[in-house]
């Protein structure tokens, strides 16, 4: 699925399955600036990338297919068609799907019935797990049923909060940077 990222006057779209995955646009001129990062398995290519940080200094892109985190200088990424990463790190344990930034750590969703998230340090080494699945009164789940019933996606504010949105239930969990549940929000459709 296509994704859109914005910082200042630059808009980036991530276009899966195109030869060049990222298309850059100027919001001022409303014109395309260029295309970046080839689809593929070469050293500077990616397969399933998502931008997890985009500011005036740097762009962090995680390729979920190779568990690799790429760091780019924002100015170089925008102005240089053949931009190369300043740094490339492989995440130690395979996170399942999404990766987010939380303070100085990376957070990855897991396919684990005990904890929803893995926390990684700056070097991609696992430093902990956290996140508890909701408990439903009068229901007990097998591990596989629990993983399916509480499928979720998450977003971070990059500093100290994670919002977990469940796909099949009207529920949002908010965690802090230490993995403590701060708030559980039930919507009108919650059952």
Question: What annotation goes with each model-predicted range?
Answer:
Residues 1, 41-48, 90-93, 136-148, ...:
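Short glycine-/Asp-/Thr-/Trp-enriched loop segments that recur within the blades
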Residues 1-21:
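Beta-strand-rich domains and repeat architectures in extracellular enzymes and scaffolds
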Residues 2-6, 50-54, 97-102, 145-159:
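Structural signature of eukaryotic scaffold interfaces centered on beta-propeller domains
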Residues 13-17, 61-66, 108-112, 164-167:
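Conserved beta-strand positions in repeat-built beta-propeller and related beta-rich domains
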Residues 27-29, 73-77, 121-125, 176-180:
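Short loop/turn segments that connect beta-strands within beta-propeller blades
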Residues 31-65, 85-90:
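Blade-loop segments of beta-propeller domains
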Residues 32-40, 79-91, 127-135, 181-191:
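Beta-propeller fold detector
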Residues 66-67, 73-105, 109:
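Asp-box/WD-like beta-propeller blade repeats and closely related beta-sheet repeat scaffolds
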């Amino acid at each position: 699925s296509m994704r859109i990222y914005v910082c200042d006057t630059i808009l980036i779209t991530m276009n899966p399955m195109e030869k060049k995955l990222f298309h850059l646009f100027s919001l001022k001129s409303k014109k395309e600036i260029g295309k970046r990062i080839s689809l593929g398995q070469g050293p500077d290519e990616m397969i399933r990338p998502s931008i997890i940080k985009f500011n005036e200094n740097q762009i962090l892109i995680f390729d979920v297919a190779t568990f690799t985190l790429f760091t780019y200088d924002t100015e170089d990424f925008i102005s240089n068609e053949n931009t190369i990463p300043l740094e490339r790190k492989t995440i130690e344990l395979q996170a399942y799907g999404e990766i987010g930034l939380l303070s100085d750590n990376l957070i990855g969703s897991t396919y684990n019935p005990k904890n929803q998230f893995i926390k990684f340090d700056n070097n991609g080494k696992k430093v902990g797990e956290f996140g508890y699945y909701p408990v439903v009164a009068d229901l007990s789940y097998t591990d596989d049923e629990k993983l399916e019933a509480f499928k979720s996606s998450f977003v971070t504010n990059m500093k100290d909060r994670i919002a977990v949105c469940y796909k099949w239930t009207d529920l949002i969990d908010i965690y802090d940077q230490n993995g403590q549940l701060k708030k559980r929000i039930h919507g009108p459709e919650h059952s």
